Amino acid sequence: SSAASDVYKRQHDFLRKGKKSPETVHPGLWRQGQLNAIHGLFEVTEGVWQARGYDISNITFIETSNGWLIIDPLTTSSTAAACLALANNVLGERPVHTIIYTHSHIDHLGGILGVTTQEEVDAGNIRIIAPAGFLEEVVKENIIAGPIMARRAHYQFGPLLPASPQGQVDIGLGQSFPLGASHLIPPQKQSTKQDQN
């Protein structure tokens, strides 16, 4: 694991000690924090793996005959790259050939440069697929509503508080927001309901 992920994990060590929730934390949030503290690479079913606990969403790796199909490359390139390295180290090195964005939330697309490059996509080595209307939704959510949502998140999740039972405990989706750069490579294909038939 990287030094950055080690620091991230150590900040929330107070949740890993199996203690009951202190008076300063709602028991439901404490339990959610303990569950979010469980991180690693998990087999969902044969050939399908998820890295959990490294970001506020999960990244899915599907083994195919010609490499990885990745679903939702997380929030930042650093967390996505760490999870791809984890999958390759544990399961064997495989090239990435397809990436699917399931929807327009930044925690499902922002880490794209951790699993591929614009050059790989431009060369036709990687396909990126998203739902119909995806780019419009990305603009609506991240450019139009983004500043308001970012401001609200400071009140909602307490990211400026120190990680402790008296400060920032968990944000529900994960331990805390990952730090790092988020990017977007537009999909070459936006699927419709018709494509699924």
Feature map (PLM): residue ranges:
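Short, small-residue-biased leader/transition segments that mark boundaries at the very start
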Residues: 3-8
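Long, low-complexity, polar/charged, intrinsically disordered or flexibly structured peripheral segments
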Residues: 9-35
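Short, solvent-exposed secondary-structure boundary motifs
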Residues: 29-33, 49-53, 178-188
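Conserved beta-strand hairpin/beta-sheet module of binuclear metal-dependent hydrolase folds
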Residues: 34-94
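Metallo-beta-lactamase
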Residues: 43, 129, 135-197
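Short helix/loop capping segments that flank catalytic or ligand/cofactor-binding pockets
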Residues: 60, 79, 110, 137-139
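Active-site metal-binding motif and surrounding structural segment of the metallo-beta-lactamase
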Residues: 66-67, 77-129
